[in-house]
């Protein structure tokens, strides 16, 4: 299966989340950064149109909406930017496409449509069992596993890491935590999954010494007997929480980010405690025993 390129054009407009509340003759615009009373009937029509198109649209389409409502284009766009309804993007994304490869592909059956409003464009959802996976250059590959095994990650890496511009990000479950690695980009030389996991295992070994019940020993045992590590007691709410975190991370990396991102976020891992719902971000550096820098 060869996946086609899906490219975003230049001079695109990000439509950010907003709401319009109308009662009698009063119309209130509410965004993350402001709340404004809207009296201009033409602007009300523009906002209603934009609300139905949340995500990314061309600047040409926005100009057309403003023209139809007899609103000066420059002043109209300035108002929408100032109030937090839109922002502009002219920079090219690092990745043209993003795909999700998973052992639970049904979990993402609605993601392609649902996530568009956040500027997240996933070209394909692929079952890990598919032996005929091919991806185009400049693709971000998200590998999501409910049954973790390091060999699965190695197989995906070895198949695609020589493709120009391809990068990887993994999500999986360990103990009571849902984990999302930082982005591994062979082109940029960022740390890979095994830099993340080996550093975590090293901490486990130091904490539990040679305790046979440690998770480090359990992972080594499962690896020896070619067994996967299943997620513990996952229900619909835990899956929904993980699904939301995946969407937000993809939005931060490829979509319409709601916050300004620092370069450290690119390399940071995310760990979410499924019991306490506490979220932690941690920058990850290369693990000295990992060979990803030599690949």
From Swiss-Prot:
Its main location: cytoplasm. GO terms for cellular component: cytoplasm. The lineage of its organism: Bacteria, Pseudomonadati, Pseudomonadota, Gammaproteobacteria, Enterobacterales. Necessary to process the inactive microcin B17 (McbA) precursor into the active peptide. Coiled coil: none annotated. InterPro entries: McbB. It comes from the Bacteria. It is found in: Cytoplasm. GO terms for biological process: antibiotic biosynthetic process. The gene is mcbB. This is Microcin B17-processing protein McbB. Keywords: Antibiotic biosynthesis, Cytoplasm, Plasmid.
